[in-house]
UniProtKB/Swiss-Prot annotation:
Residues 557-616 form the KH domain. It comes from Paracoccus denitrificans (strain Pd 1222). Involved in mRNA degradation. Catalyzes the phosphorolysis of single-stranded polyribonucleotides processively in the 3'- to 5'-direction. It catalyses: RNA(n+1) + phosphate = RNA(n) + a ribonucleoside 5'-diphosphate. This is Polyribonucleotide nucleotidyltransferase. PROSITE patterns: KH_TYPE_1 (PS50084), S1 (PS50126). It is found in: Cytoplasm. InterPro entries: ExoRNase_PH_dom1, ExoRNase_PH_dom2, ExoRNase_PH_dom2_sf, KH_dom, KH_dom_type_1, KH_dom_type_1_sf, NA-bd_OB-fold, PNPase. It is an enzyme of class 2 (transferase). Its EC number is 2.7.7.8. CDD domains: KH-I_PNPase, RNase_PH_PNPase_1, RNase_PH_PNPase_2, S1_PNPase. GO terms for molecular function: 3'-5'-RNA exonuclease activity; magnesium ion binding; polyribonucleotide nucleotidyltransferase activity; RNA binding. GO terms for cellular component: cytosol.
Length: 715
């Protein structure tokens, strides 16, 4: 019934298995990849005809983590998987980015890749497994895909690279000082196609070494996919890249002169308008048949690409007049908004980010519901890219994959320099509003985010800056690395290489390569050039603010932290939360109690914090023998007075300890409700508190000297 094929290898510490032919047999390609006990099913389908007039490649990648994979039931009212989580969105991008450039040029049929996590052992992250499964499914599907690719995760601990570290080692990397790197690399047998990483001030050499280590480690996986394809691949889909050389020649003859003139304009807006005029002139000169050719868009792009790339390779200035290593002019401003906790406006050329930091309490932490368990994050970074930032009219709604991906990249770059939660017990939310964009807006978010947090008083270990690098690589082997690329250079170039870090090292690296042939020499040059650019930007940022402010904004909350014995937590909370509610209502402060006995008291008002602190302290602290306390008489009896002191504690002042003279009854000198000063004398055999008054001056609260007590008794 089934024509099943299964291939396995030992990969690192686990067995990697690829199997096909048993499940989802109506898909063009279906593979279940299993690493350890983590299994991901990848299914590929593609249209056998392109849609008429379609001039782009419609590739869609979906990745979904099924809760049953980890033996869990989804939360929420409907109890089923709903919209993609941030992790699912980011993993879909990880799969998409290395495979998209590997489809045969000119292939514009719709392709759908669906990856579903079927089992998760809570040890091996399913993202790497999904990338391998997707590559294998594409390779056996018959679609014109120039793969396969493979992927690997690389860690760095004790000076050694680690292949595919466990989930728990990578989770909350900031709190794991032994692990300094989380890097995902994907590539073919000969070339690296994609890198995504989070690092802790690693050197350029260490980062490059990690990329090489990951690329070498994935080679057995590529061999395994080829082995599977030899046994199970379908017949290749007949497709030849279209020959539009005649159309390109017509487009070039009609528009080259005007297009070159347009690309000589330095201002983005004027250049864009001139390009549109040049395109309109080309279209006006084409025949009706040529206008309907689905390769017209490709011909126009080839013309633009040749003009932009050829000038750079020949050593001429870039389209905005810069050389290959110069960063655009930078302007930094902090304290830009009056009522926010921290803000900055970072402008680099025609790219601008307004970045705002808000400080919150433990109640504001993000709760993350993942397959491997729930967790909380006290650092959030949100990136918004509205249409007006590029002068366009477009859809406005919830953040898309691109915004989530760019926000996560900036998050990775900045979180490496955050203080430990124990040293800075605030929740930090950074929002980057891209107000102008002409390339590298995610790196502008990094720079603006660093300034904004320092403006809010966050004690960063060091400022962070980021820069986007580009590459022009010609077929004849000539190449040029570009610093601080423009949007057009990103669109028409061969590499997008984003590097962020401090003066001491790299905190985040993201690389997307559109062509094969990127050598270690090119990557070394890109990293070296990126370091120079990063240090220059840090220097410009330091002119606005070089370290975190000593004082918070008047509108930001203050947080006081105290630790109590865990057996006292019940007393602070009280029956049904009665005590903690009273503390919050009386003081006006927010109080957050952790299971380990850590209490965070937050308020914008210092008096509120002190009041809540004192109320909690009076509940949990133990009175000390020999100390003097202020109390209130709550009951008088023949043998003495019961006094409430030190919060809710009661003690007995024996009638002989009330005054320096003999009393027949305490009511001779005391009345209920009277405030008195008492000294804790000790505890009786049953643990009852013994108090004294006669040795304390009731006016000053000071202890009376022995000779003075004798004089008082004689008088």
């Amino acid at each position: 019934m089934f024509d099943e094929v299964k291939k396995s290898i030992q990969w690192g510490q686990e067995t990697l298995t690829l199997e096909t032919g048993k499940v989802a047999r109506q898909a063009d390609g279906s593979v279940i990849a299993t690493l350890g006990e983590t299994s991901v099913m990848a299914n590929v389908t593609f249209a056998k005809e392109p849609k008429p007039g379609q001039d782009f490649f419609p590739l869609t990648v979906h990745y979904q983590e099924k809760y049953y994979a980890a033996g869990k039931i989804p939360g929420g009212f409907f109890k089923r998987e709903a919209r993609p989580s941030e992790k699912e969105t980011l993993t879909a991008r990880l799969i998409d980015r290395p495979i998209r450039p590997l489809f045969v040029p000119g292939f514009k049929h719709e392709v759908l890749v669906m990856c579903t996590v079927l089992s998760h052992d809570l040890v091996n992250d399913p993202d790497i497994v999904a990338m391998i499964a997707a590559s294998a499914a594409l390779t056996i599907s018959g679609v014109p895909f120039m793969g396969p690719i493979a992927a690997a995760r690389v860690g760095f601990a004790d000076g050694e690279y680690v292949l595919n570290p466990e989930v728990q080692d990578m989770d909350h990397l900031r709190l794991n000082p032994e692990q300094r790197l989380d890097l995902v690399v994907a590539g073919t047998r000969d070339a690296v196609m994609m890198v995504e990483s989070e690092a802790y001030e690693l050197t350029e050499a260490e980062m490059l070494g990690a990329v090489k280590f990951g690329h070498e480690a994935m080679q057995p996986v590529i061999d395994l996919i080829i082995d599977l394809a030899e046994a199970a691949a379908k017949e290749p889909f007949e497709f030849a890249s279209p020959d539009y050389s005649a159309l390109y020649a017509r487009v070039k003859s009609l528009g080259e002169a005007d297009m070159r003139a347009a690309y000589a304009i330095h201002d983005k807006g004027e250049r864009r308008d001139a390009i549109e005029v040049a395109k309109a002139k080309v279209l006006a000169g084409l025949s009706e048949e040529e206008l309907l050719d689905p390769n017209l868009g490709s011909a126009l792009k080839k013309l633009e690409s040749g003009i932009l790339r050829g000038g750079i390779i020949d050593g001429r200035p870039r389209i905005d007049g810069r050389d290959n290593k110069t960063v655009r002019p930078i302007d930094c401003e902090v304290g830009f908004l009056p009522r926010t906790h921290g803000s900055s406006l970072f402008t680099r050329g025609e790219t601008q980010a307004l970045v705002v930091t808000t400080l919150g309490t433990g109640d504001d932490e993000q709760i993350i519901d993942a397959l491997h368990g729930n967790s909380r994050s006290n650092f959030l970074l949100h990136y918004n890219f509205p249409p007006y930032s590029v002068g366009e009219v477009g859809r406005v709604g919830s953040p898309g994959r691109r915004e989530i991906g760019h926000g996560k990249l900036a998050w990775r770059a900045l979180q490496a320099v955050l203080p430990a939660p124990t040293d800075f017990p605030y929740t930090i939310r950074v929002v980057s509003e891209i107000t102008e964009s002409n390339g590298s807006s995610s790196m502008a978010s990094v720079c603006g985010g660093s300034l904004s947090m320092m403006d809010a008083g966050v004690p960063l270990k060091a400022p962070v800056a980021g820069v986007a690098m580009g590459l022009i690589l010609e077929e004849d082997g000539r190449w040029a690395v570009l610093t601080d690329i423009l949007g057009d250079e990103d669109h028409l170039g061969d590499m997008d290489f984003k590097v962020a870090g401090t003066e001491n090292g790299i905190t985040s690296l993201q690389m997307d390569i559109k062509v094969a042939g990127i050598t270690p020499e090119i990557m070394e040059q890109a990293l070296a050039q990126a370091k120079d650019g990063r240090l220059h930007i840090l220097g410009e940022m330091s002119k606005a603010l070089s370290e975190g402010r000593r004082e918070f904004s008047a509108h930001a909350p203050r947080i006081e932290t105290m630790t109590i014995p865990t057996d006292k937590i019940r007393e602070v909370i009280g029956s049904g939360g009665k005590v903690i509610r009273e503390i919050v209502e009386t003081s006006g402060a927010k109080v957050d109690i952790s299971d380990d006995g850590t209490i965070k008291i937050a308020s914008a008002n210092a008096d509120s914090i002190k009041k809540a602190y004192d109320m909690i302290y009076s509940i949990v602290a133990e009175p000390e023998e020999g100390k003097i306390y202020v109390g209130k008489v709550v009951k008088l009896v023949d043998f003495g007075a019961f006094v409430n002191f030190f919060g809710k504690r009661d003690g007995l002042v024996h009638v002989s300890q009330i005054a320096g003279k003999r009393l027949n009854h305490p009511n001779e000198v005391l009345k209920e409700g009277q405030e008195v000063k008492v000294k804790l004398l000790g505890f009786d055999d049953r643990g009852k508190v013994r108090l004294g008054m006669k040795m304390v001056d009731q006016e000053t609260g000071e202890e009376i000297a022995p000779e003075k007590k004798e004089e008082t008794a004689e008088g």
